[in-house]
Amino acid sequence: MDFSSFVASQLNAGTIWPEGIIIITLMVILIGDLIVGRSSKTWLPYVAIAGLLAAVVALYFEWDNPNTLSFLGAFNGDNLSIVFRAIVALSTTVTILMSVRYVEQSGTSLAEFIAIMLTATLGGMFLSGANELVMIFISLEMLSISSYLMTGYMKRDSRSNEAALKYLLIGASSSAIFLYGVSLLYGLSGGETTLDAIAAKITNVNGGQSLGLAIALVFVIAGIAFKISAVPFHQWTPDVYEGSPTPVVAFLSVGSKAAGFALAIRLLVTAFALVSEQWHFIFTALAILSMVLGNVVALAQTSMKRMLAYSSIGQAGFVMIGLTANSDAGYSSMIFYLLIYLFMNLGAFICIILFALRTGTDQISEYSGLYQKDPLLTLGLSICLLSLGGIPPLAGFFGKIYLFWAGWQSGLYGLVLLGLVTSVISIYYYIRVVKMMVVKEPQDMSESVKNYPEIRWNLPGMRPLQVGLVLSVIATSLAGILSNPLFNLATDSVTSTPILQSAVISTQISQADK
C-alpha cells in the first residue's frame, strides 16, 4: 500500500460526504448572495433546502457502512450518528421553510440568516458523530456561536438583543465548564483524545476509580445539561425563547437539543463507562427536576413561546427516561421520541409564526376564537399541541408509551409514574390553548382575532410556511398510526451500534451480580 492509499484509508473522508454537501450548499449561498445581491432571496432558500434534503439522502446511503471511523478516529459515522444527523438536517429544512416570510418582514438579509443556520447545522451534525475531544469541542462551539448569532439576528428588536446577550454569557460559561471537564479526561487518560482510547487508559489507572473522574463527570454533565435545557441548567431557556426570532427558537428546541442528546450518549457511554451508575443517578435527578418544573411552571405562562420553552424543558425530562433506562428499548424509545418531536414541535412553531405575522402577538389569550377566522391554523396547532401532550392516536402518545415502557422494564418505576403524572399536567395547558381557539361565541373572540386579516397564501414567503405546516401536521398524524417503521429504524440504529451494545451488556452483567 502506497502512502496516498494509506492516508486515504485513514481519513475515510467519504463518511462525511453528507456534511460536504451542506458545505458546498453554504458556499453557493454566500457566493450567490455576493454576486446577485438581495434579489437572490427568491431562490436561495430553495437551494438550501435542496442541499439539506440531498444530505439526508446521502445519510440514507451511509446506513450500515462497515467502515464508520474517519479522520484517524475523530469522527464516527455509525448508524446512531446517522439518525441524529438526519434529525438535525431535517429540523433545519423545516426551519428554513418557516424563516423565509419571517426574515423578509423583519428587513434583514435572508441569505446571511440561512448561511448562519447552515453553519449551526454543520456543527450539530459533526457533534452527533464526534468521537474525539477536540472534534467534540470545535463542533459544540460551531453550533453554539452560530446559535448566539441567530438569536440576536433581529438587531432592531431590543428583546432579541437581550436574548442574545443572555445566551452568549450563560453559553460561554457552560462551554468553559464543559471544557474543564474534558481537560480532566485528557489528563486522566495520559494525553489521549479519542473516546475509546480514553476509556481504555482510565480503566488501567486505579481501575478508573478516582476523584478526578468524578469531578470530570460533574463538569461534563453540566455542559451537556445546558445544551438540552435540563433543570437546573435551564435558566436561559424561557428568556431566550421569548426574545429570539421564532424560527431560531424552533431550531434550538429540536436540532440543537438532538445534537446535545447525541453528545450525551456517545461521551457518557464511552468515556464514563466506569462511573455508569453515577451518571445514571445524576440524569435520573435531572429528569425528575425537568419534568416537574417544566410542566408545572408552563401552567402559569401567558406567552405561547414562553409556554413552549417550559414545555421543551419537560419534554427533555421525558427523553432522559430513555437515557437512564440504559437498555436497547430505552435508547430506541429515546431516538423515536426525538424523531416525532421534530415534527410536532416545529409544526407548533410554524403555527405561532403564522399567527404572529397576521396579528403581531404571541399571547395565549389572543388565540381566543381563532377557529372562526382561520380553521386550518387552528387544526394544525391543535394536532401539534395534542401530540405534544400525548393524546392518542397522535405520534406523541406512542412516543411516551415507548419511553415509559422502556423505563418500566428497566425498573425505573418511580420515574415512570412521575412521568405519567407530569404528562397529565402538560395535557392541561395544551388543551387550554385548543379550547380557547374553538370557542363558539363571537363575543368571546379576542381583539386580535376580531381584526384578523384576510388569509392570503400568495404573499412572498407564505407558500413555504404553508408547505411546512402541512408536512408537519401530516407527519405528526401519520407517525402515530404508522409508528412501527420509525421505531424499527430507531431500534436498528441502537442494535447496530457497538458502544451501546457494550453498555447494555455491562448493565445486564452488573444487575445479575447484584
From Swiss-Prot:
Catalytic activity: a plastoquinone + NADH + (n+1) H(+)(in) = a plastoquinol + NAD(+) + n H(+)(out); a plastoquinone + NADPH + (n+1) H(+)(in) = a plastoquinol + NADP(+) + n H(+)(out)
Swiss-Prot/TrEMBL keywords: Membrane, NAD, NADP, Plastoquinone, Quinone, Thylakoid, Translocase, Transmembrane, Transmembrane helix, Transport
Listed GO CC annotations: plasma membrane-derived thylakoid membrane
GO molecular function, one term: quinone binding
Entry membrane topology: Multi-pass membrane protein
TM region positions: 16-36, 43-63, 80-100, 110-130, 133-153, 168-188, 211-231, 245-265, 279-299, 307-327, 335-355, 379-399, 411-431, 467-487
Subcellular compartments: Cellular thylakoid membrane
The organism's place on the tree of life at top rank: Bacteria
Top enzyme category: translocase
Family: Belongs to the complex I subunit 2 family.
Protein name, UniProt field: NAD(P)H-quinone oxidoreductase subunit 2
Organism: Gloeothece citriformis (strain PCC 7424)
Lineage per the UniProt record: Bacteria, Bacillati, Cyanobacteriota, Cyanophyceae, Oscillatoriophycideae
